[in-house]
């Protein structure tokens, strides 16, 4: 009898760690795994672009203007994806453009997330007049088209990568404020918060130590989706001439510079467009997987 009991104890399943549980639910979404693999590849290219890119992104080959990709007639293996109207290698510019796009996306998400979380915690925890003021400002910002608002801000401060990133941060801010506030309103009346308040915990400890960790799941999902929105909006600003300025290798600017050659040299617009499309799609797929892995309702 004791032998049977011992065997049962030994064969009991080992509980998963939080990281193992997260990966268990995340990998069930095959699209999210594909998106993660693509993002890792793009991140690798962005980090090591200096070493793996064939040429400097600003280097011009005047004897190979609008050269087609290597597999087309007239193409060359020296320029695998062809060249643009001034002889710059398209593949090299795409690789360096990945670095800029990911950097801007990261900057926008981090800044908007930090400011949005702080404002959302204040609005949800204190309520009353403070909540009304913050949320009415947020409502006004959400009433304006996001890209139009970003264009106006960049036009005021001048077109540049930094100003475009700050404008996109301002545009993305309301989403994090509302999401954080909604999560705080759910948590603020729970027993553990009340007990902590009775024990003498101050407002700062309540907001950032007790409540904030329980609001992370929806914020992580929104940050993933916000990353793709930042890349897409940055490309749109670059396309309109309000983002990165030539000759900076940025995907939207690459499209804007060669738009007049779209019919005669399809590769100069197709490859930057595909880079934007696939990167945005990959982050959106990752966002779906993160939601599946972090939302308790979807785990059931």
UniProtKB/Swiss-Prot annotation:
One of its GO terms (biological process) is dipeptide transport. PROSITE patterns: ABC_TM1 (PS50928). Disruption phenotype: Inactivation of the gene abolishes use of heme as an iron source. Residues 1-31, 123-136, 228-230, 287-300 are cytoplasmic. Residues 98-287 form the ABC transmembrane type-1 domain. It is a multi-pass membrane protein. Residues 53-101, 158-206, 252-265 are periplasmic. InterPro entries: BP-dependent_transpt_permease, MetI-like, MetI-like_sf, OppC_N. Pfam families: BPD_transp_1 (PF00528), OppC_N (PF12911). Keywords: Cell inner membrane, Cell membrane, Membrane, Peptide transport, Protein transport, Transmembrane, Transmembrane helix, Transport. One of its GO terms (molecular function) is dipeptide transmembrane transporter activity. It comes from the Bacteria. It is found in: Cell inner membrane. The keyword Iron-sulfur does not apply. One of its GO terms (cellular component) is ATP-binding cassette (ABC) transporter complex, substrate-binding subunit-containing. The chain crosses the membrane at residues 32-52, 102-122, 137-157, 207-227, 231-251, 266-286. NCBIfam families: PRK10913.1. The complex is composed of two ATP-binding proteins (DppD and DppF), two transmembrane proteins (DppB and DppC) and a solute-binding protein (DppA). MppA can replace DppA as binding protein for heme and ALA transport. Part of the ABC transporter DppABCDF involved in dipeptide transport. Responsible for the translocation of the substrate across the membrane. When a foreign outer membrane heme receptor is expressed in E.coli, DppABCDF can also transport heme and its precursor, 5-aminolevulinic acid (ALA), from the periplasm into the cytoplasm. Belongs to the binding-protein-dependent transport system permease family. OppBC subfamily. PANTHER family: D,D-DIPEPTIDE TRANSPORT SYSTEM PERMEASE PROTEIN DDPC-RELATED, OLIGOPEPTIDE TRANSPORT SYSTEM PERMEASE PROTEIN APPC. This is Dipeptide transport system permease protein DppC. The gene is dppC.
């Amino acid at each position: 009898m004791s032998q049977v009991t011992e065997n049962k104890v030994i064969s009991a399943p080992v509980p998963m760690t939080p990281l193992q549980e997260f990966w268990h639910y995340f990998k069930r979404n095959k699209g999210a795994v594909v998106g993660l693999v693509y993002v890792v590849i793009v991140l690798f290219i962005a980090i090591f672009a200096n070493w793996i890119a064939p040429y400097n992104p600003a280097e011009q080959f005047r004897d190979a203007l609008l050269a087609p990709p290597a597999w087309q007639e007239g193409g060359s293996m020296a320029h695998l994806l062809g060249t643009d109207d001034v002889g710059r290698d398209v593949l090299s510019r795409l690789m360096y453009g990945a670095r800029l796009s990911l950097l801007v996306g990261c900057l926008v998400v981090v800044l908007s997330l930090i400011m949005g979380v702080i404002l959302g915690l204040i609005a949800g925890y204190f309520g009353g007049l403070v909540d009304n003021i913050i949320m009415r400002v947020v409502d006004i910002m959400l009433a304006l088209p996001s890209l139009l608002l970003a264009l106006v801000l960049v036009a005021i401060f001048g077109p540049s990568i930094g100003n475009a990133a700050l404008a996109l941060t301002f545009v993305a801010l309301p989403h994090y404020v509302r999401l954080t506030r909604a999560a705080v309103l759910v948590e603020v009346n729970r027993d553990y918060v009340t007990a902590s308040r009775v024990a003498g915990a101050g407002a700062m400890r309540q907001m950032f130590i007790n409540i904030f960790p329980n609001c992370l799941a929806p914020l992580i999902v929104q940050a993933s989706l916000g990353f793709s929105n930042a890349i897409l909006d940055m490309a749109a600003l670059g396309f309109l001439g309000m983002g990165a300025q030539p000759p900076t290798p940025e995907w939207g600017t690459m499209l804007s510079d060669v738009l007049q050659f779209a019919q005669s040299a399809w590769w100069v617009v197709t490859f930057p467009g595909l880079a934007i499309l696939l990167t945005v799609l990959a982050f959106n797929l990752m966002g779906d997987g993160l939601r599946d892995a972090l939302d308790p309702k979807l785990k059931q």
